Amino acid sequence: MNFEFVADTDARLIRPIVHRDERGCFARTWRAETFSQAGVAFVPKQGNSSLSTLRGTVRGMHFQRPPHSDAKIVRCSRGRIHDVIVDLRPESPTRGRIYAQELTAVSGVMLYIPGGFAHGFQTLVDDTLVEYLMGEFHVADLYDGFRYDDPALPIVWPEPVRAISDRDRGWPDIAPRTPWLADSAPAGAL
């Protein structure tokens, strides 16, 4: 696996080494020693998957508040997604920055997202499957989010939004809950 920093954050793009032959292909997606050697202190505690049947589906923006901020590894195992992260850590030099990356089943590229980031994605094709390894267990009382179209964080979604849950549509704005956001660096993209 090859690890690349995402712009100026401690998030990482992870490019598995893919072995191909007449049967198809094989790639290792997790090995504790490899992650540790790359400086990624991550131990999976939970695995999740989501299947979105419609192109243009948005899921997000989600995060889990301290003390159980959840690092995660995201992989698109079928289809393509526009994956978005926002650094919400108040002391981070990249707080408030938006980063986006296309993840596809064909490339196998994964995204490591440290705790303290919000995460969301939009499907770019029908029948898209996304899998996550989570560094924390889900804690319902600490689960939080903000709207995908929050005016304080101008996230660009490449497709018209065709499907979104009532919960994701109903999240409150982020700015009243993060007073430091107004002083943050301008939004950036990968």
Question: What spans do the regions from the language model cover?
Answer:
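Non-catalytic, conserved peripheral segments adjacent to functional cores
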Residues: M1-S107, D127, M134-L190
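Conserved metal-binding segment of the jelly-roll/cupin
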Residues: L103-D126
